[in-house]
Amino acid sequence: MLNEREKILLKTLVERYIHEGQPVGSRSLAKFSGLDLSPATIRNVMTDLEEMGYVSSPHTSAGRMPTTLGYRFFVDTLLVVKSLDNEQITLLENQLHPNNPTHLMNVTSRLLSELTRFVGVVVTPKRMGGAVFRHIEFVALTEKRILLILVTPEGDVQNRIILTETAYSQSDLIEAGNFLNQHYAGCTLEEIRSGLQRELTQLRRDMTGLMNAAIEIGNDALQESSEAVVIAGEHRLFDVRDLSDNLSSLKSLFEMFERKSKLLQLMELSRQAHGVKIFIGGESDETMLEEVSVVTAPYEMEGKIVGTVGVIGPRRMAYERIIPIVDITAKLLSSNLS
């Protein structure tokens, strides 16, 4: 645990590094920390922080810069979030109209990019994810093509063709439908998918092959209710010095933007949070994101989480400004969709 002096100096170092983009030396820390300490004493504290993994010292400079661990401690413990000014709030309120959901998602990602000067991301609601089902049925079309029939409480019928890697018999499919109808009728497809993932984790060892097949068929079906990722402002990353100097990192990021599946997996994690969630560098376990941070927040429709909004930028971002932008955008989007 850091003592108060270490916290103040780490906070000052992160803030100066975010502001200046250069390793921070002891004289700068003495000037901006408000502590009456000599440069020698500050250097000793920096050595301690470096040994604990909160800061690092590049070979070309006598100053220090925050590590991922340093950023994480700063964000979780030391950060003071700023309120959005009235002009920014008014802009969001005026632009986020619920008239056209697809247009609304495009506008949201664009506004996030414009307000932060980084990349704005919106994961749109699943086409079928919010539907409550009364009855599900699977019909074999060919060996690995299955027709999913979903009936809502209102009597609406939705059909979807599923391509599976495993061949299932019609009796397997009937058993799968019976299992889902018995255990999950009245749930949304999103709730079913979460439940099936738990079933796969908890019951796989003692489940019969047939029940295993039933759950996997259901999981295949629900995974097919695809989401879309709306991205705006990718070009802004070329203006970020921390990233533009590293072409291989930029290339990896743009590959992720193009494929979107990796980004979707990351954004999916924020559904489990009740507010803003922040991934810093390698915390996401995704090598493409080692040089960036992702700030996300879930949004709702009729009280259920249906998607996420987020901003992708350098680790050296003004978190105190980005966090409220993402947070308020998610809340306004929820309000307009409901």
UniProtKB/Swiss-Prot annotation:
GO MF annotations, alphabetized: DNA binding
Alphabetized InterPro entries for the sequence: GAF-like_dom_sf (IPR029016), HrcA (IPR002571), HrcA_C (IPR021153), WH-like_DNA-bd_sf (IPR036388), WH_DNA-bd_sf (IPR036390), WHTH_HrcA_DNA-bd (IPR005104), WHTH_transcript_rep_HrcA_IDD (IPR023120)
Presence of the UniProt keyword Transcription in the record: yes
Keywords: Repressor, Stress response, Transcription, Transcription regulation
Transcription regulation in keyword set: yes
One of the Pfam families matching this protein, by short name: HrcA_DNA-bdg
GO biological process: negative regulation of DNA-templated transcription
HAMAP family reported for this sequence: HrcA (MF_00081)
Record family assignment: Belongs to the HrcA family.
Record function comment: Negative regulator of class I heat shock genes (grpE-dnaK-dnaJ and groELS operons). Prevents heat-shock induction of these operons.
Name of the featured protein: Heat-inducible transcription repressor HrcA
